Design a protein with these regions (language model features):
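Short beta-strand element of the alpha/beta-hydrolase
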Residues: 64-74
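Catalytic active-site module of serine/aspartate enzymes centered on a nucleophile-bearing elbow/loop
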Residues: 272-301
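Hydrolase active-site cap/lid region
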Residues: 153-207
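Catalytic histidine neighborhood in serine/cysteine hydrolases
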Residues: 249-266
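A glycine/proline-hinged amphipathic helix-loop "lid/cap" segment
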Residues: 1-60, 285, 296-301
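Gly/Ala-rich beta-loop-alpha elbow adjacent to hydrolase catalytic centers
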Residues: 140, 144, 148
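Short beta-strand/loop motif that positions the catalytic acidic residue
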Residues: 229-231
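Catalytic nucleophile-loop/oxyanion-hole region of alpha/beta-hydrolase
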Residues: 80-81, 87, 100-135, 275-278
Length: 301
């Protein structure tokens, strides 16, 4: 298992926490060079939006340039389209790829498997439009990261060509809440066991927490595309990421785990700031490098 520890100073951690507190009250402005193009109904009936920086071409040239599908977080229950557009913009800015932000259905009105079905449908719609799987990268954060991992399991089981790579930040991979870090990091994170229990109850609505694909750690890991997992060392979900990365590695998969020292859940929100924080610069650089190195190989199933 390849693990990289990303160092941070106490000032870095404090700056990230401060940024997270101000995002709702003083949201950043979407940069003027951002291009937004709604794509419903061309994503299998799932709402979505192309977000591109510097007018990177989407649509007809996507098969040539490659695209990223971005799946937002929010505990399977919440969405903030403005902040999600900025997150998608940052991804496009750093990678040179158009980014498709997926507006999946939310719990509790639409519990499992609605959100997962939407992510899978959006991915398959790009294949139907002629975008090769080998030119697609899946990216998700928090609940969106969980959905990305679940989608990979569903797609592989169905024999659908898998994407070139996936990038996930702070996934919840074990909905049984069995990871030791849930208690070990209690009080050091912005999330705790009670929050996780609420999230899984709303999302699962009676579905079993010890089964895949809803709980990705309980799946089969052979044949997955290269994975980059990113997580903060103070997160209660630290071991969810560690355990999943270890399981994929043990199954012979290509996986890299980045652990950001001193960082809490949702630390990736630092990339939304108009003044880039050091952790944000590092995270975006790592993501960009990973995506640029994703093998353009034969479509894998």
């Amino acid at each position: 298992l390849n693990v990289t520890h990303i160092p941070a100073t106490p000032d870095d951690s404090a700056a990230v926490m401060a940024e997270m507190r101000t995002l709702q009250s003083s949201p950043p402005v979407l940069p003027v060079d951002a291009d937004r193009t709604p794509v419903l109904p061309h994503t299998g009936g799932v709402p979505g939006e192309w977000v591109t920086a510097s007018r990177h071409a989407a649509g007809p040239t996507a098969a040539e340039t490659g695209v990223t599908i971005y799946v937002h977080g929010g505990g399977f229950e919440y969405t903030n389209p403005h902040l999600e557009r900025i997150m998608a913009y940052r991804l496009s800015q750093m990678t040179g790829r158009p980014v498709l932000a997926v507006g999946y259905r939310l719990a509790p009105a639409h519990p499992y498997p609605a959100a997962l079905d939407d992510v899978v449908a959006a991915y398959r719609s790009l294949l139907d439009q002629g975008v090769p799987a080998s030119r697609i990268v899946l990216a998700g954060e928090s609940a969106g990261a969980t959905l990305v991992l679940s989608a990979l399991l569903v797609l592989r089981q169905a024999g659908v060509p898998l994407p070139a790579a996936a990038v996930v930040v702070s996934p919840q991979t074990d909905l049984t809440l069995s990871s030791p870090s849930i208690d070990a990091n209690d009080g050091q994170d912005v999330v705790n066991r009670a929050v996780l229990d609420h999230v899984r109850t709303q999302y699962l609505a009676g579905a079993r927490p010890d089964q895949a694909p809803q709980s990705p750690l309980h799946g089969e890991f052979h044949g997955l595309p290269p994975l980059l997992l990113m997580v903060g060392s103070k997160e209660v979900l630290l071991d969810d990421a560690r355990r999943f990365a270890g399981a994929v590695s043990a199954a012979g998969g290509s996986v890299h785990l980045d652990i950001y020292e001193g960082m809490p859940h949702a630390f990736h929100a630092a990339v939304l700031s108009t003044t880039p924080l050091p952790v944000a610069t590092t995270l975006l650089r790592r993501v960009s490098e990973w995506i640029s190195q994703a093998p353009v190989a034969q479509d894998r199933t």
